[in-house]
UniProtKB/Swiss-Prot annotation:
Cited function: Efflux pump involved in export of fusaric acid, a mycotoxin with low to moderate toxicity to animals and humans, but with high phytotoxic properties. Constitutes a self-protecting mechanism of the fungus against critical levels of FSA within the cell.
CC annotations in GO: plasma membrane
InterPro entries on file: MFS, MFS_dom, MFS_trans_sf
Full protein name: Efflux pump FUBT
Species assigned in the record: Fusarium oxysporum (Fusarium vascular wilt)
Region (Disordered): 1-44, 570-593
GO terms of molecular function: transmembrane transporter activity
Reported consequences of knocking out the gene: Blocks the secretion of fusaric acid and results in decreased resistance to fusaric acid.
Practical use: Fusaric acid is phytotoxic to plants such as cotton and banana. It has been shown to induce programmed cell death in plants. In addition to a mild toxicity to animals, fusaric acid exhibits acanthamoebicidal, antioomycete, and antimycobacterial activities.
Localization per record: Cell membrane
Keywords: Cell membrane, Glycoprotein, Membrane, Transmembrane, Transmembrane helix, Transport
Disulfide bond positions: none
Length: 593
């Protein structure tokens, strides 16, 4: 059952980083597929065709195409998406794309909602198990600690097994663990289940942005990311509001039941409606099944020039590479520390607000949760602000007529860096019971507004600065900020008892104030700093190569090239030092003679 190879012309290519950097030139170096002529057409048996079409949602016309290659192991057929391929996520109708973004944002909301909703039932957990406040707070910290490890594992697995399979498995198990937590018989089992739920349920935190990248090109991606970016912050802010009332009225077990129901409904909705979107996985599976059906050898054009990568290799890179970049690149380290401080401050609020509003003002558990309304308003304001910022950036890029610099992403971070300490100091010194309760809550509006502005702007800055290393950079940033988010609530009570409400609330404000110069420095000197950073400089070289030669470079290729450049520079510097030392010895000997 042969499919004769025919000469081909360029056709529509799938979305890659190269598409983003090259622009709209999708017609370079991609094999095309053309309908077979009647005389050459070989028909796949109807039974096999039906099975293949039902299982993999492709039509007979796809199998009947001609592809470059000979169908052998040495020269396999190279397949790509058809121009009107229904499985190409880039070609989905706009309303479907936005519906899928909404569903994935809801999945992230469900995950982060559960991280803080637990705080609404902490008093009941303390009474039920006879434990201290600090031990009960571990339910928040261990859940957020799961965010450190989960995305490092689920992100590479989603590239091997597809976004849909990873989401289906992780959210199914997270729903089961969340339901199990509702029936926990001891504090140990509750805490273990909380950690496992956070680790396994954190898949959308890394896979949702990847799904957005699968569906949207660079010109539209900013608005989609803006919509998604609110979920990781709205969830923690809404959690105590709902959790406070439910925990007070029905107890902590019903509160965990609500988390399980929220996760379960989201799991069903996303599984039913969102298709697989990752192009390399779709084409890889399609090639495998066509090889089985026809007896010929097929390969995806996206995998044709790459060595096969095992799950163990990808997991090793995913677990080690982010830390390498974090500690070797000053830009990554400084921005990640800044984001981690303000992210940890947000989670510190879950331990601090009950002290300020319930203990200090005598509010009930349910009413105390409403204190987080200010954070909700601040997050909404930041999303609106970023929608306008996205339009400003697009207009500036159009006027310039040339690629924008990464530093052009920083104006929102400059504004946000000022709003954060203003909001935190405002909150800290208006928490006196004699001051109206609305005043400190207004301070949290400015804090949350600035928090999301800084978060989004600095992440965009890192992505634009490191391009091909973006996945590892995001993993490093996510891991570090999750560690801070897990740690901050654990020492909050002791800090407030020792320093008092006002000075304890001022500590994160002083930390944020110390970080204010960073966005300004990066805006003014960022380019010079980047060119002195090993991997940032290599990313710039790769970006230039992709723009000029219209080639796609993988993260592994770029990492290897960067390491080779570093070894070459090290060797040259050692050789130069040895030569200089030898020259000095020669001069010394000449003088002595």
């Amino acid at each position: 059952m042969a499919i004769d190879p025919q000469p081909s012309s360029p056709s529509l290519s799938s979305e890659t980083i190269a598409n983003d950097t090259i622009g709209n030139d999708n017609n370079v170096n991609e094999p095309s597929v053309e309908p077979k002529t009647q005389e050459n057409q070989h028909t796949v048996p109807p039974r096999l065709s039906r099975i293949y079409s039902q299982a993999h949602h492709i039509s007979q016309s796809f199998i009947d195409q001609n592809y470059p290659g000979e169908g052998t192991t040495q020269a396999p057929y190279r397949i790509n998406f058809l121009p009107d391929d229904t499985q190409n996520a880039q070609l989905l109708p706009r309303w479907k794309k936005w519906a899928f973004v909404l569903l994935q944002s809801l999945a992230c909301l469900a995950t982060t909602f559960a991280s803080s909703a637990y705080s609404g039932g902490i008093k009941q957990v303390i009474r039920a198990f006879g434990i201290s406040q600090e031990v009960a707070t571990l339910g928040i910290s261990l859940y957020v600690l799961g965010f450190t490890f989960g995305p490092l594992i689920w992100a590479p697995l989603s590239e091997l097994y597809g976004r849909k399979k990873v989401f289906f498995f992780t959210f199914m198990v997270a729903t089961a663990f969340s339901a199990g937590a509702a029936g926990a018989g001891s504090i140990a089992s509750l805490l273990v289940l909380r950690f496992l739920t956070g680790s396994i349920g954190s898949a959308p935190l890394s896979n949702a942005p990847a799904l957005i990248a699968d569906m949207f090109d660079k010109s539209e991606r900013g608005l989609a990311m803006c919509m998604f970016s609110g979920a990781p912050f709205l969830g923690p802010a809404i959690g105590p509001i709902a959790g406070g009332f439910l925990g007070e009225a029905a107890g902590w077990r019903w509160l965990h039941g609500l988390m399980a129901a929220f996760t379960g409904v989201t799991w069903i909705a996303c599984t039913v409606f969102i298709p697989e979107t990752y192009a390399p996985y779709i084409l890889r599976k399609r090639a495998q099944h066509m090889s089985k059906l026809t007896g010929k050898v097929y390969i995806s054009t996206l995998d044709a020039d790459k060595p096969p990568s095992s799950a163990a290799h990808q997991l090793k890179n995913a677990l080690t590479r982010p830390w390498l970049l974090l500690f070797k690149e000053p830009i990554v380290f400084i921005t990640s520390i800044y984001i981690s401080i303000i992210y940890g401050t947000m989670y510190m609020c879950f331990a601090a607000f009950p002290i300020v509003f319930q203990k200090g003002r005598g509010w009930s558990q349910g009413i105390g949760g409403l204190a987080f309304t200010g954070i909700v308003i601040g997050v909404v304001l930041s999303i609106i602000s970023f929608a306008f910022e996205d339009k400003r950036y697009a207009r500036a890029a159009q006027r310039r007529g040339a690629p924008m610099e990464p530093e052009d992403r920083l104006p929102p971070a400059i504004m946000g860096s000022l709003l954060i300490p203003i909001g935190l100091f405002w909150f800290a010194w208006t928490t006196f019971p004699s001051v109206h309760w609305i005043v400190p809550i207004i301070g949290t509006v400015f804090f949350a507004w600035g928090l999301v502005l800084v978060f989004m702007a600095l992440l965009n800055y890192l992505i634009d600065s490191y391009v091909i290393f973006a996945a590892s950079i995001m993993a490093a940033n996510s891991a570090l900020r999750s560690l801070f988010g897990a740690a901050f609530p654990l020492f909050t009570r002791q800090m407030y008892d020792g320093l008092g409400v006002q000075w304890a609330s001022s500590i994160p404000a002083f930390l944020a104030l110390a970080c204010v110069p960073f966005p300004f420095l990066f805006y003014k000197y960022g380019r010079q700093i980047r060119m002195k950073c090993e991997y940032a400089a290599e990313a710039a070289n790769v970006l230039q190569k992709m723009r000029s030669l219209h080639v796609t470079v993988t993260e592994d290729d770029a990492m290897n090239e960067a390491e080779e450049m570093w070894r070459a520079r090290t060797h040259n510097s050692h050789a130069s030092a040895a030569h200089s030392h030898g020259h000095r010895r020669s001069l010394s000997y000449t003088r002595s003679v």
